[in-house]
Swiss-Prot record:
InterPro entries: A-amylase/branching_C, Branching_enzy, GlgB, GlgB_N, GlgB_N_E_set_prok, Glyco_hydro_13_cat_dom, Glyco_hydro_13_N, Glyco_hydro_b. Pathway: Glycan biosynthesis; glycogen biosynthesis. Signal peptide: none annotated. It catalyses: Transfers a segment of a (1->4)-alpha-D-glucan chain to a primary hydroxy group in a similar glucan chain. It comes from Parasynechococcus marenigrum (strain WH8102). One of its GO terms (biological process) is glycogen biosynthetic process. Keywords: Carbohydrate metabolism, Glycogen biosynthesis, Glycogen metabolism, Glycosyltransferase, Transferase. HAMAP family: GlgB. Catalyzes the formation of the alpha-1,6-glucosidic linkages in glycogen by scission of a 1,4-alpha-linked oligosaccharide from growing alpha-1,4-glucan chains and the subsequent attachment of the oligosaccharide to the alpha-1,6 position. This is 1,4-alpha-glucan branching enzyme GlgB.
Amino acid sequence: MGGAAVLDWMVQDGERLANCRHDHPLAILGPQPSDAGWTVRVWMPEAHSVTLLEGGREALMTAPNHPWVFETTLSHDPGSNYKVRVERGGITHEQHDPWAFRDEWMGDMDRHLFAQGNHHHIWQRMGAHLTQRDGISGVMFCLWAPHALSVSILGDLNSWDGRHHPMQQRLGGIWELFIPGLAEGSLYKYEIRTQDGHCYQKADPYGFQHEVRPDNSSVVARLDGFQWSDGSWMQRRDSSNPLEQPISVYEMHLGSWIHASAEEPWIQPDGSPRAPVPAADMKPGARLLTYAELAARLIPYVKERGFTHIELMPITEHPFDGSWGYQVTGWYAPTSRYGTPDEFRAFVDRCHAEGIGVIIDWVPGHFPKDAHGLAFFDGTHLYEHGDPRIGEHKEWGTLIFNYSRNEVRNFLVANLVFWFEQFHIDGIRVDAVASMLYRDYLRPDGEWLANEHGGRENTEAVQFLQQANHVLFQHFPGALSIAEESTTWPMVTQPTEIGGLGFNLKWNMGWMHDMLDYFELDPWFRQFHQNNITFSIWYTYTENFMLALSHDEVVHGKSHLLHKMPGDDWQKYANTRALLAYMWTHPGKKTIFMGMEFGQRAEWNVWGDLQWDLLNYEPHKGIQLLVDDLNTLYKAEPALWRDDFDQFGFQWIDCNDNRHSVISFMRRESSSGTWLVVVANFTPQSHSHYRVGVPLAGFYEEIFNTDAARYGGSNLGNMGGKPTDEWSIHGYENSLDLCLPPLSLLVFRHDPKRSLQAASASACDKADDETADTN
């Protein structure tokens, strides 16, 4: 190639760099072989002079072809072992040359697995990584944007000018650039120029930390600095079957549990202050608690209540508080509202130290249209479908992932592995599964597209969920994967190997709606709706169900749980206690939303906090004590949880006394053969001498009574227990003559020791009677 041609080529490359239109800067920058040896070219926009520093020598670089492309010739290849001294705007500094580092970061196998959708640790390649190259510290940036014309790094390091740090395009639509000297905490974004010339500034899809809203830049964060202390917890978790354990979950939203005063400083773990994060404009003077403050206050509270797990509404980064976290933009980062990723790790570590598992809400069903997020990422519908009939939730104003694209599926599946591996979470609850499974979800006729078979099922979403759950349990066998699925889609909790979706628990939405419909009725009318409280048993063994009274039931005009109840205040409290006790004794794992544990009155408000002052009133304190005791009873009695998903674990005694709105049943445990008798009266009318058949004669201790004075009840009961009579009822030869308090639930346990004493006393009495007869 002639000199004029080379000159013309260099001028064109310089202009492409200056206009952010170059996709292969390594083709001309860095050390390049030349006729005279090696030509080193550096790209320094708006620099006045550049000097090469190498091997103790200095060489002033010239710009013969473009004013910002500086070069000099050496007799040898300097590799990456050189620096440049740059004078720009009267300021001089020295730096390593980003384009001296030519080796690819993403290897062939990485690209292959990613293109297949099977790279379970793709986050170890994608994103911004603090690393060393050739012994030099810096940050390696890696991005997937296959349709972009060019991609640049923006940040404080270049005054947010995309001309300074163009990235190199590799195979498979991958873009890379190593920036030496860049440190942890640096802000950055990607500037993506599309094929039609538009320019977008995007946060890193794989960013490990982001700014506090309303700012939305990504933050360079370290992944490997935290020292965990939960090894024994993790070992126990992964070697046990969670379905055979008691699971009682406290669902909560970190930002509205309780607030601190904005006057109270936010102290970081190193003791330095940090600017507080305001709770909301509508609550001036309040700030959000930090992860550290939540660990100090929330964890002891949850432990005292006796819950086994905390479920966090989405803590992935999101721009809008009002979305409750369900419109995610930062999939690989805990929200910075409450602190740093390591501070969230410390929160989880503390939970495990106190015996509490951590479940997070995971939202793979949709994402928002925010300009800095995934939408139209590289100038094409990269993460979403282009056709709005399958790519948009119009009612929610969000976009739907394109599950048929391998790299998109990989982004989500690896994200699941990331949260379990990096943050030691114990489970996920997958939000809005029904919206993923059906193409016509919330869509009128004509606004949805049938699948390849002409049906409404989203086969790509089904395959994605199966893959996600398969990979999850492959890596973390003791994990929880909970589906919020509101339809009758079959085999949600069956293994993927036999065609199931692969979850191990499913929220029982039918139970929830039936219970709330029933308890909202005036008690007199409940006799006509007995089916509401008994129907769930007919299908409870078709899936592994979790009973949930969730956040969705205490917003948007639905009232909080206490205020759903009919009657005067006394009846509202009693109904609430009875419902919670029925939930804890019914087959299935348990979840309640924050505030229900003490009878919150007001609807949940994401910008407020809970009505903690209500605990100054005895009835509310009574509900809290009831929940404490329910959790204690639940964990102490394997009959209430061991056989949740085996029909042996439940047996009706009587479900047909609709006239009195009374039900009775047994919870049984197969390995020990123990059982509990549960009797519930769902009217304000108490009953004396109410007969309940039992399978074995003897003494039955009353171990729980929702009407106890301790809980704010009328303190009716059975004096601690009752012996059986030889009175046949409900198919049993023996029965209990019980007092049923109003709006109550009672639990009885057969006491072998006292039964033996009672039997002995009965035998003596019988012998005395026979002696008296002979006289």
